[in-house]
Amino acid sequence: MTSSLDDIEPTAYNNMEADEEYCRRNDIHDLSSVVGDAVSQGVPDMDGQTTDSSKDPEPNSEDKKAFPPSSGSFFSPNLQGQRKKVLLKFVFTNCLLAIICFTMFVLFWGALYDTSKYLHKVKLLVVIQEPPVVILDNNSSMVVPSISYALPTFINKIPCDWDIYNSPTFQAKFDVNTPQQVNDKVVDLVYDEKYWFAINIKPNATETLFESLINDTAPLFNSTLFNQVVYETGRDPTNLKSTILPVAQTIEEYYHTFYTLNYLPPLLTNITQVYRYALTNNARYIAAAGKYNYEYYDHRPFTDRILLAPTQIGVVYCLLLTFFQFLLYGPLHVEMAKVLRPANGLIYRIAMSWFTFFFASLFFCTTTAIFQVDFTKSFGRGGFVVYWMSTWLFMLAAGGANENAVMLVITLGPQYLGFWILSFVILNIAPSFFPLALNNNVYRYGYMMPVHNVIDIYRVIFFDVTRRKMGRNYGILVALIALNTALLPFVGKYASRKLKQKALVAAKQS
């Protein structure tokens, strides 16, 4: 007797459906792993064509239970749990963004805020080679104050860290004798970065002014021959002229006003009425005597704008390259960790990073060379090699820190990687792009940051500033490389253990 579908009892039919569902659930994880491996490459269909399994995904029973049926409204009673989840995530995300703004951004903004109150930390030099009182005629009958006698009064009104010398004290301290040796030593002190700038008042300014006023054959008085400000833009191309050099310009402005209103008129009166000298009839001489300006001598000038790329913002891009290389190698590192012993895996990781940075640093430096930057100012024809090797050390130091930090951040969640890289960039550039002398002492942590040290090295290469800090700069970079390399196996073990624990918890909950 033939049975139809209607003859089957409902209970038996329900049991068949339950068995089918049970089997499908047991195979769901194995199936998902297979599909997961195939998604990136596509799944071949029966005709041998590659299809994308993500185009028409089949909803499984787990998805159906995890999410309630769509009600069409965010405020549906069925979505009460989801609304709570969204609210908590919203609050957490905004709190995290607030923390970043009120820590990292505050750190960067603070490096630029109210820098004038830190002028007392800026070391400046003043050398006055002319005595405060000058004898103007051969008979020693005309004694007048020198042009620069009041300069210390104006200098002390500006709260910088001043070192003021007259000619005898400067010669004794620095073992120099002649005025030319004094001038050369002033330049050397600025070059060695003992001072941010120096005001050098040279001798015989008052006598030259007097001769120009009474003698038609004397040269015109030119104050810039006797007043010189020595500085180096190459020491800080973006900040020195805007934040520190204005101090010298302010002193020049103050003293010019004092000279034209308070010094020159009484001097002219003394010359004509007290000492009975006749002033020159040449108006050009009188007009020239009314000007009192400084000569600004930039010992290491910044003349090529393209150098801002490798010595400032380009360093940030180089830092980001060290972050990207780790992300690109991430899947390969996971695969190799499964087939290599721990010791061999560690050697593999270090070798991959070091060789990658070796070539990446070459590519970065070649980009600078493409724009015809002069590498010969400090190290001659070997300048490019010095630049390349310095960049390699920088990438090793920064890349090692990134690699260790990224592994730790991933244990919290890969969604936080952006916060790390943003924080790492700001921690590096805040004490590196702006002079530490004009910042709070908290920014002195920058001395141990890779960006700060490599920028110092780059300024030697491109501007030929002093090399006296290069030993410290290279030493810190090498120390950072050694530290990050030593921490790598411990950080790797910790991150691996945490990820395994997360995987076990997830497996138990599934």
From Swiss-Prot:
Sequence intervals crossing the membrane: 90-110, 124-144, 313-333, 350-370, 382-402, 417-437, 475-495
Localization terms from the record: Endoplasmic reticulum membrane
Chief site of localization: endoplasmic reticulum
The keyword Transmembrane is annotated on this UniProt entry: yes
Topology Lumenal: residue spans: 1-89, 145-312, 371-381, 438-474
Compositional bias annotation for Basic and acidic residues: 53-66
Biased composition annotated in UniProt, kind: Low complexity: 67-76
Keywords: Endoplasmic reticulum, Membrane, Transmembrane, Transmembrane helix
GO cellular component: cytoplasm; endoplasmic reticulum; endoplasmic reticulum membrane; membrane
Family: To yeast SNG1.
Note: Present with 639 molecules/cell in log phase SD medium.
Protein name, entry field: Uncharacterized endoplasmic reticulum membrane protein YJR015W
Organism: Saccharomyces cerevisiae (strain ATCC 204508 / S288c)
Lineage of the organism: Eukaryota, Fungi, Dikarya, Ascomycota, Saccharomycotina
